[in-house]
């Protein structure tokens, strides 16, 4: 026989049971940070990771970041996966004086970034974004065309939030087929990334693939602890590659360069505008050469024609913004097209013998040049881009000094004291010029001493 509980006790137990076991489960405090259980209705395409370890990492990071939204307002955001995450909350202290926010999650994909973009990044109203993403998509067998589709959506959301916000798009780092990230697939993805942003002045592509790739187009063990994640030396190399671009964007090195030329030398660049510099008419031979190149090669560089001389006296930048003066640096910025052949020249010529000294700093694989009266001495990220790739004293992504001594119709050229050219042929007179081609090149302390 079933015994019945007294009515007051039964009512109390029912009430307690109702509280302890609600018919509809209440959402957890972390539900807003969780990965959606299915892909239904989610933006983008391709893999979204849902392994238990990844979900825990995702929730933990996003919960911590939500508590820092007010503190991280107007930071430069580093956005990505474990490579970014592993750099630490302050990016290893690599950018002193710059407010940064690390928004990398280990294991994330382009689609994962797209899902969390609004809360993790846009809510901070960032001054800019440094983006490195895509390697985990490759491991999960996503096709490069799918991955770049997600990149386009990410960029569209960033631009919708702030059309003028600068974005530094880092090429996917090399890895290894042993890590399910073969070189040919990474290269294809990087090609598509570059094509997706071609012509966009707000996006600067940084060649971080050439920065790291070894002779086999893989990640070197000396810089990557597991052929995927950089070690301390690898992060230092990435930071050095970023600094020149961040300086051009106005985030670093904002103070003028305090430099006084040696006795007998005269500055050709005043450090704050392009007075004394301009564009000269494009020679007919260059026009014809450009036409032949562009007709035969769909990937040929843009090569704008200058019809008449243009002076930039008093201007902080050339009319197209490619050449600009900032804090003592004459910058040849990365062209939105990826490559664009141009030449900025002094408005005066130099018929007398002279010694020309200047310093330059190149982003990875950058290609520029110094015109000596007319012919061009290649000035590049030499160890990657050549042609002087055996230099022992060249300092990648740091300042290096070029000295050019002209006697008659020949020039001796050195870099940090190492010989580049013993007798480089030059004409009797002509200007000093700086070429723009690929990547970013900065020049400073440009001075000349005319000899008797």
Model-derived regions: residue spans:
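Acidic/histidine-rich helix-loop elements
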Residues: 40-53, 88, 96-112, 139, ...
């Amino acid at each position: 026989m079933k015994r019945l509980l007294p009515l007051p006790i039964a009512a109390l137990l029912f009430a307690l049971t109702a509280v302890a076991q609600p018919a509809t489960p209440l959402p957890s405090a972390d539900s807003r940070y969780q990965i959606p259980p299915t892909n239904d209705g989610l933006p983008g395409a391709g893999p979204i990771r849902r392994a238990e370890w990844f979900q825990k990492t995702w929730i933990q990071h996003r919960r911590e970041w939500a508590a820092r939204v007010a503190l991280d307002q107007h930071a430069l955001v580093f956005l990505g996966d474990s490579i970014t995450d592993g750099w630490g909350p302050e990016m290893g202290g690599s950018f002193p004086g710059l407010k940064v926010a690390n928004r990398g999650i280990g294991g994330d994909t382009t689609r994962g970034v797209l899902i969390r973009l609004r809360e993790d990044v846009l809510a901070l109203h960032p001054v800019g974004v440094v983006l490195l993403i895509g390697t985990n998509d490759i491991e999960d067998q996503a096709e490069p065309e799918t991955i770049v589709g997600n990149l386009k959506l990410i960029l569209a959301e960033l631009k919708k939030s702030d059309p003028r916000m600068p974005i530094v798009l880092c090429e996917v780092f090399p890895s290894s087929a042993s890590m399910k990230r073969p070189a040919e697939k990474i290269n294809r993805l990087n090609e598509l990334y570059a094509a997706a942003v071609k012509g966009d002045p707000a996006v600067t592509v940084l060649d971080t693939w050439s920065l790291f790739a070894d002779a086999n187009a893989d990640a070197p063990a000396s810089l990557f602890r597991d052929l995927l994640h950089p070690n301390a030396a690898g992060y230092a190399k990435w930071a050095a590659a970023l600094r020149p671009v961040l300086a051009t964007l106005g985030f670093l090195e904002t103070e003028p360069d305090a430099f006084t030329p040696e006795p007998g030398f005269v500055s050709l660049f005043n450090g704050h505008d392009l007075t004394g510099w301009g564009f000269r008419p494009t020679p007919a031979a260059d026009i014809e050469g450009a036409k032949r190149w562009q007709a035969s090669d769909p990937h040929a560089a843009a090569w704008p024609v200058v019809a008449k001389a243009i002076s930039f006296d008093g201007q902080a930048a050339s009319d197209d913004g490619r050449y600009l003066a900032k804090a003592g640096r004459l910058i040849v910025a990365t062209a939105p097209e990826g490559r664009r052949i141009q030449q900025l020249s002094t408005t005066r010529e130099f018929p007398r013998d002279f010694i020309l000294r200047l310093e330059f700093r190149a982003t990875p694989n950058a290609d520029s040049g110094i015109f000596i009266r007319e012919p061009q001495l290649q000035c590049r990220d030499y160890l990657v881009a050549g042609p002087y790739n055996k230099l022992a004293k060249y300092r990648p992504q740091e300042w290096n000094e070029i000295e050019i001594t002209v006697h008659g119709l020949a020039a001796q050229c050195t870099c940090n004291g190492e010989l580049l050219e013993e007798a480089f042929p030059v004409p009797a007179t002509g200007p000093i010029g700086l070429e723009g081609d690929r990547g970013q090149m900065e020049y400073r302390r440009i001075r000349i001493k005319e000899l008797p």
